[in-house]
Amino acid sequence: MTSRMQPKSGVYSVSKADFTKIFEDVPKVPITSAVDLRNKFDAVRIILSNSSEDWNKRQTQLKTVRSLVIHGEKVVDRPTMIAHLVQLLGCFELAVKDLRSQVLREAAITCSFIVSKYGIETHSIGEDILVPAMSQVAVSTKIMATSASTLTEFIVEYVQTRQVFTILSSFSTSKDKSQRRQLAALLEIVISKWSDRIKKQIMRQICELIKSAINDADSETRAAGRRAFAKLDEMHSEEADALYLELDHSKQKMLRGGDAASSWASVNSEKGSIPIRSKLSAGSKAHMNISAKFLAQRSASAIDPKATKFAGPSRLVRPTSTKTMARQDTSPAGCKYSNFISMFFKTLLLSAKIPYPNRPGSRTRTSSITSTDSRDTSPTRRNSPLPPETQKARVKYGNGSFFAKLGMPDTTDDDEFLLPIRIRSPLKTPTIEAHDKVSQVLKECCSSSVSEKKEGIKKLLPIVADTSLNPIEIKNIGNCLNRLLSDASNTMVLEIYSIFVRTHSSRLSEWLRLALAKLFARKAAETLPNTKKQIGHTLNVILECFNAHHQLVTVCELMCDPIHLMVPKARVVLLEYLTSLLDEYTEPGASINAKELKTAIRKMLTWASDPRLSILLTPHVEKAICSMFCVNVADFSALISDLDSEQKNWIHQTLQRNGLENGISSNNIATNSGATASRETSNTSFQKESTSFGLPEFGARKGGTGVNLGSLNISNNLALSRLEEQSTSRLMEKVNLNSTVTLPPDTLEKIQNVQDLLQKMRSSENADEQESAISSIYMMICDGGFGVWEQCYAKLLLNLFEILSKSRSENNKKMCLRILGKMCTAQAAKLFDSTEMAVCKVLDAAVNTNDATTALAVEDCLRTLATHLPLSNIINIAKVILNQEPIDDERASLVLKMVTRLFEELPAEELNNIVDDITPTIIKAYQSTSSTVRKTVVYCLVAMVNRVGEQRMTPHFTKLPKAMTNLIQVYVNRAISTSLPRL
């Protein structure tokens, strides 16, 4: 009988090699024509989309997919085959999420086969299944975890997109150590396999993820992080050097140990004299010929292999006492003292043969060589034959105090052994001691000990005020202060920062850019008002002390830097700083016509046109543009001369809207005095202007189009009907408007192609033709080739709404839901007016289906709509649906899940304003007779407590039954306990 117990060696684990062997191990499926292939794919989709189907059938169908791909290439072309596979996207996602290990394994093999065969062309499949695959890595069943991890390796290797890297980055803070470990392993693939063009854009994020892995609490994750660092060092040595310097000393030592030599041959080889890149502490540049063996803190002979050529067979004899031991200087700098060494050369050679039994204090020693170790081949050590005066002189330059004068850390005997003998003039001692003091204080400031760091910061305060610091010391202090910004809660750090800037601003031009980047990021991440105010004071000091034009150019360069990718809140801080610089510290009429400013204006317009960030950034972008205009109208006109007409039109409208009535006129350029007056008008207008312009849709209509839900009767379905009518009327206005636009011929051709596809979408009689049109539009949107949003957006949206409401094809509904999500992500601002209608149509698609994959697509689409569209509109439609009498259980459950996602993903600052508005409605929904709705209400309330705090929600909980309050508290405590980091 075969035992059911499996050995611990991992019989059920799989690897990439196992997957590759099974790729084509599938039964042959005969395919006669393209229609036959499509019918077979439809049959596969029907079985895989049903999660309650027998798992053996689903496993067989996944093998059939591979067989269809292998044997269908002779029947259809490559794009058609990819279109068939994209239609199975929901099925693949459902299979990867399956709890049955056989189904998951087969799904992982099939998806790996697809992405390895078609690569970037199937990026939509790889991007969508990467998240569930990473989730399965955390499963305790080994076959499931290894199958999922192997699938992620295939996806990361063959689908090289920014979206894949963004998904991976989201798992860096996972509570599961298996996911963090897998992320570190995938980083090694990213570094070795991805193209340099993509890696250049994300190199800073890659380094941060490697740093996080090296500092992880899990030992295996740290080991994987070190392997990723080794690969980074191999492929991109400069970035590896910079990352190395950011690590703690203990982590540097771990990385350093891997680079060390481990044999006598490596120490004495010519390669041993090659300079090791800057992985040494300060002062290491004077010893660039040291072998890497000493960096691993191991002892070895000090005899230079080149010096032995001159010494011949005789070797220097060193004393046995460590207090009187002298070192031979083998560095180039030590050649100055060759005369000093030659004074004792003959005496040292004789001492190897002549004992001194009668010398006071001398001792004889016999040595026996019983080992072949390299250390035993060193010369026999005897007592020094030199006079006592000479011994004292040698002790002066050989003991530990010598290292303090060099500014080197006296950590081990090996470090002491590496240093040459240098006789310094007594006149230079004060300078050496001052340099040693600065180095020692900086070392304390970067210490991992909290108390030592605090003492170092206190000592640093008088040092930064010293005007006699040399350029190297100023550079080291500046770098140290930038690192200390992570502990900006210590107000003394910011005070030292301000003093340092005031004292040495004329010598910190190159340092300014990095300092501003650190300060912007720190202020954006800070939540304490007092600390944020202190950081603002430090920024004001920089504004006062540096040249205004130099600051302007530096800020614009930082804004466009592809390496320092700032988070949205940091961009807000940068724009506020830029506005203050232009308004308060730049003289009216000053020249601003520079290429850096022209690039910065383009970058600001890009930020403002991003639908995810427009609400946050657009008001600040408008302020910065108006401030530039007020400084020098003529230069500003020249800066925007290369922009397209739509961007110029938007800038002109922005200037008029903010009090600059004349805008930019080619016939009437304002004078400097007029610019000053305009600036005052602009500042006054900004205080009155609402900060929610939303979208820089260049040339788009800005009228108020909000839907007033307060007057709607929510006792029946009339509310939803009225919402749809208002949204539809606005859409029809856009359709009529777009039909009158004059366009160039190439754009007209694109529009005609899209119009033909839209017409096919409307023909519900031919389901196959409709499905083909939907697939074509979806592929165009995924590949970024749609390109005619302005003219076809409204018509496409109406077609999607009609299919979601009336179509009987579940596959068409799922494709339309994915298209709607892509449209919302790419052009969210165009969907603002139709928010309520979009949510209603998506809910209709969910209510009229029994397909599990359609339900998943509905939840994903609602999540996208909720996080990209106006928050007030989302809350209003949620209230309408939850307040219906009687409550629609299925719609209410989906809406509650949507609100839960809102509170899980959006920042607390945005959500605080809607808590009082939505909470009573959610609590009322708990009265539903459906257990599913009640459970969803509890999850939603728990998410609200976790995001805005228990104190904020307490007034609403007083109206709840005690049992429900206790239940919520249990879930909150459970969420808190699971969010704690694992040790």
UniProtKB/Swiss-Prot annotation:
GO terms for biological process: astral microtubule organization; establishment of mitotic spindle localization; mitotic spindle assembly. Microtubule plus-end tracking protein that promotes the stabilization of dynamic microtubules. The gene is cls-3. This is Protein CLASP-3. Belongs to the CLASP family. Residues 359-372 have a biased composition (Low complexity). Transmembrane segments: none annotated. InterPro entries: ARM-like (IPR011989), ARM-type_fold (IPR016024), CLASP_N_dom (IPR024395), TOG (IPR034085). Keywords: Cytoplasm, Cytoskeleton, Microtubule.
